[in-house]
A protein has these predicted regions:
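N-terminal amphipathic/basic-hydrophobic helices that include classical n-h-c signal peptides
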Residues: 1-22
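Hydrophobic transmembrane alpha-helical segments in integral membrane proteins
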Residues: 16-39, 139-141
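Structural signature of hydrophobic alpha-helical transmembrane segments
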Residues: 26-35, 85-97
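Loop-to-helix transition at the N-terminal end of transmembrane alpha-helices
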Residues: 51-67, 88-91
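A generic, lipid-embedded transmembrane alpha helix
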Residues: 63-78
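Non-cytosolic membrane-interface motifs at loop->transmembrane helix junctions
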Residues: 82-93, 119, 142-143
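Membrane-helix boundary connector in multi-pass membrane proteins
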Residues: 102-118
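Juxtamembrane boundary at the C-terminal end of a transmembrane helix
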Residues: 129-143
Length: 143
C-alpha cells in the first residue's frame, strides 16, 4: 500500500498509521520549531534588558493557535484510534500544552522587567518537551 493511500485511511489504526500526523508528524514539528524560535527571541529580549512587548505577544498567540489545533487533533485521533495508551495522561498533557503559554504570558506581562521576559522564555522552552511527551504517551507502553 502506498504512503498516499495509507494517508487517506480512516479511522487511525494505531501508532504507526500515517493518520497520526497531528501528534507525531510535521504539525508537531512546527510547534516545536515555533516554540524554540520564540524562546530564542525572548532570551534576546532578556539580554537586551527589555520587558515583554506586543511583538512577543503576537508570537505567543501564533503558538497558542497551533497548540489549540494540537489539542483538537490529538483528541480526535484518540477518539478514532484503537490502540492502547494512557488516554487520561495524553489528554492531560495536551491540555497543559494549551495552558502553559497563557499562564507564562500573564505572569510575564505582570512583571514589567526582563524577569517577565525570562518567564516567557521558560514557558516557550517547556513546549517542545511537552510535545515530545505527548508523542511518547501516544506511542503507548514500551515505546
Amino acid at each position: 500500500m502506498s504512503v498516499e493511500h495509507q494517508w487517506h485511511r480512516w479511522p487511525a489504526r494505531g501508532p504507526t498509521d500515517a493518520r497520526i500526523a497531528a501528534v507525531t508528524g510535521p504539525y508537531a514539528t512546527v510547534i516545536i520549531v515555533v516554540a524554540l524560535v520564540l524562546a530564542v527571541w525572548a532570551f534576546v529580549l532578556v539580554a537586551a534588558n527589555r520587558p515583554p512587548n506586543l511583538s512577543i505577544l503576537a508570537g505567543a498567540a501564533v503558538l497558542e493557535a497551533l497548540l489549540v489545533g494540537f489539542l483538537v487533533g490529538g483528541v480526535v485521533q484518540m477518539l478514532t484510534s484503537h490502540h492502547s495508551f494512557a488516554k487520561a495522561e495524553f489528554v492531560g498533557y495536551l491540555v497543559a500544552c494549551v495552558l502553559i503559554p497563557p499562564a507564562g504570558f500573564v505572569w510575564g506581562w505582570g512583571e514589567k522587567t526582563r524577569s517577565g521576559t525570562a518567564v516567557l522564555a521558560v514557558a516557550f522552552l517547556i513546549m517542545p518537551v511537552m510535545v515530545v511527551r505527548v508523542q511518547q504517551v501516544w506511542a503507548g507502553p514500551g515505546a
